A protein has these predicted regions:
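Extracellular attachment/recognition segments
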Residues: 63-165
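Intrinsic low-complexity, repeat-rich intrinsically disordered segments enriched
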Residues: 1-78
Length: 165
């Protein structure tokens, strides 16, 4: 069976909250007569921010790939999203192979490493660092540096943001 309507609203309350289906090819969610969420025919979704005056694109704010991995003994992901594999390319250097490619190589991201072979999070002085080494649409590289050079690290956390292809 099928239900065909233009609007669903709160009949028992103040009558200014509900779902508006009357606009062309989009769904509009309103509360207190104000649009709070819009989803268009392509799935692009915008939502009103905390202050109520700005909107945020949900897709733009989501991580497109993230991974928690170890580089000790055998480089392996503990958990991930949109990651097809990891490649141990050298001591302290790992290539992250993205399952669904990015739209271009200008995306942004974060990378944390403890730059140590144990589970410690205490290596925060200036001789320990981690960063991105390369960006392509299907891959990014991480590099972990310890006090004596590149080092395979136990704790590595990486995420990237941007548009998928």
């Amino acid at each position: 069976s099928e239900l065909r309507v233009d609007k669903i609203h709160n009949e028992g309350g103040d009558n200014d909250s509900g779902i508006d289906l009357s606009t062309n090819d989009q769904i509009v969610l309103k509360t207190a007569a104000t649009t709070r969420l819009t989803m268009n025919a392509t799935g692009q979704t915008t939502i009103v921010g905390e202050g109520g005056s700005t909107t945020t694109s949900v897709q733009q704010g989501l991580a497109k790939m993230w991974v928690n991995y170890t580089g000790i003994t055998t480089t392996a992901a503990r958990d991930s999203l949109n990651l097809s594999s990891l490649t141990d390319s050298a001591a302290g250097q790992t290539l992250l192979n993205i399952n669904n490619d990015m739209n271009n190589d200008d995306y942004s991201g974060y990378y944390y490493t403890n730059a140590h072979a144990n589970t410690s999070y205490g290596n925060f002085d200036n001789v320990y660092a981690g960063g991105f080494g390369s960006f392509t649409t299907g891959q990014c590289g991480n590099n972990a540096y310890g006090s004596s050079g590149n080092v395979d690290s136990y704790n590595n956390f990486c995420g990237i943001f941007g548009d998928l292809a």
